[in-house]
Regions:
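Beta-rich strand-turn-strand
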Residues: 104-128
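Outer-envelope exported proteins of Gram-negative bacteria
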Residues: 59-65, 117, 121-123, 133
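Conserved active-site beta-strand element of glycosyltransferases/polysaccharide synthases
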Residues: 136
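Hydrophobic beta-strand core residues of beta-sandwich domains
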Residues: 34-36, 96, 114, 130
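Flexible, glycine/small-residue-enriched loop-and-beta-strand segment within the central core
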Residues: 25-27, 43-113, 139-140, 146-149, ...
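Conserved acidic donor-binding loop of glycosyltransferase catalytic domains
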Residues: 72, 121, 127-128, 144-146
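Terminal amphipathic alpha-helical/low-complexity segments used for targeting or macromolecular assembly
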Residues: 1-33, 39, 61, 74-77, ...
Length: 173
């Protein structure tokens, strides 16, 4: 492993277990190359793309719950867009826009955008992009509600629930 790779892994391990979800953890991930906006919370034991951190972009006022996993490539499946030299290109693979809430244990797969104000419920697996102000749930994650207001760190939960509109299920029961 190269010195840069060792540095990346050391910063990643420090970020997993450091205190300071809104201070130290985001700062360590920024040093790894993850683009992280202001006032973003990174939960304990959250793993953000181990090998290609520069392929992840996280907006302002985002909350990542405990044990969130964000993957930005599939090296072993050969789905990467590689350059002629065999290296991954520098395109962002995972984009999390402003005011997004991602619940504990959620998994974000490569090549998705999570739109402004979206909510990913706990344990969900996001395999496709999520529309702005939409709540998704399940494996694979599917839209279950429209959010009238983002679930921000400063948003009273009663206000969030008051503006939540369920999406009618299209599946037969």
């Amino acid at each position: 492993m190269s010195p840069a790779g060792i540095r990346n892994r050391a910063l990643q391990l420090a970020a997993l277990y450091s205190p300071g979800g809104d201070t130290i953890r985001p700062m360590l991930h920024r040093r790894r190359g993850v683009k992280i906006g202001r006032r973003t919370w990174v939960g304990f034991d959250t793993l953000i793309e181990p090998s290609y951190p520069h392929r992840v972009e996280i907006g302002d006022r985002v909350a990542l719950g405990i044990r969130v996993l964000i993957l930005a490539h599939f090296a072993h499946l050969g789905r990467n867009r590689e350059s002629a030299s065999g290296e991954l290109d520098d395109r962002v693979s995972v984009r999390i826009e402003d005011d997004v809430f991602i619940g504990p244990g959620a998994i974000i797969m490569p090549n998705v955008t999570i739109g402004h104000g979206a909510v990913v419920t706990s344990g969900s697996v996001v395999t496709r992009s999520v529309a702005p102000l939409t709540m998704v749930q399940g494996n694979p994650a599917r839209p279950i509600a429209r959010c009238g207001v983002p679930l921000g760190l400063d948003t009273p939960i009663k206000e969030f629930y008051a503006h939540l509109t369920p999406i009618a299920s299209t599946s037969a029961t």
